[in-house]
């Protein structure tokens, strides 16, 4: 669901409401790929629980998301990873650079607005640490960034009773880092060990 000047709006408000109604009838959380525009407004009106991407979210929309206590998931690499631009034609690259400035402003505004968030990779798997670094660079506190890739992500997925933090009774899944990401978020890229279900696998 988008409806920016560049991306089509695929679902009507009535269709979104039907999705939400069916999901709630079986206690399923709803989420939408949503960059901004009318699509974002319609997702909120329909009752979608989580908005993915929000690249073009406006300040009035930030205020509404905050008031209605919805989740957002930031996936900044598609907009901020300059290495991806080399895959584009020179014409498209120029347009993407212009969009980058707009997206940075919108995401920074959402972060400043205090929205509760998770952080994801969208289609760029294996890059979660870099996504976290981008969000830190856009103004989020490192503690909030860490929550975005751990407990908040688990809450969004409805899995926070079994994972997302280190606590008795939860899955023993965690990474050991060389440094402290609260001091330097880049420490997320310096993994020295990985424990999965209580077993050292790296």
Each model region followed by its residue ranges:
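Short aromatic-centered micro-motifs
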Residues: 194
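Active-site core of metal-dependent hydrolases
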Residues: 2-101, 112-118, 139-141, 155-157, ...
């Amino acid at each position: 669901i988008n409806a920016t000047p560049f991306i089509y709006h695929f679902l009507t408000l009535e269709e979104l409401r039907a999705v939400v109604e069916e999901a709630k009838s079986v206690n399923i959380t709803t989420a939408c790929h949503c960059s901004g525009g009318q699509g974002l407004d319609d997702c909120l009106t329909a009752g979608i629980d989580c908005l993915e991407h929000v690249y073009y979210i406006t300040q009035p929309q930030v205020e509404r998301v905050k008031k209605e206590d919805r989740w957002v998931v930031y996936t900044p690499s598609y907009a901020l990873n300059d290495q991806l631009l080399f895959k584009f034609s020179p014409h498209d690259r120029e347009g993407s650079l212009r969009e980058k400035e707009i997206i940075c402003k919108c995401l920074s505004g959402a972060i400043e607005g205090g929205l509760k968030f998770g952080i994801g990779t969208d289609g760029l798997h294996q890059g979660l640490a870099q996504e976290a670094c981008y969000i830190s660079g856009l103004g989020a506190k490192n503690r909030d960034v860490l929550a975005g890739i751990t407990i908040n992500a688990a809450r969004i997925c409805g899995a926070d009773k079994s994972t997302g933090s280190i606590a008795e009774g939860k899955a023993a899944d965690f990474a050991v880092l060389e440094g402290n990401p609260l001091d330097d978020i880049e420490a997320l890229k310096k993994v020295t060990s990985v424990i999965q279900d209580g077993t050292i696998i790296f």
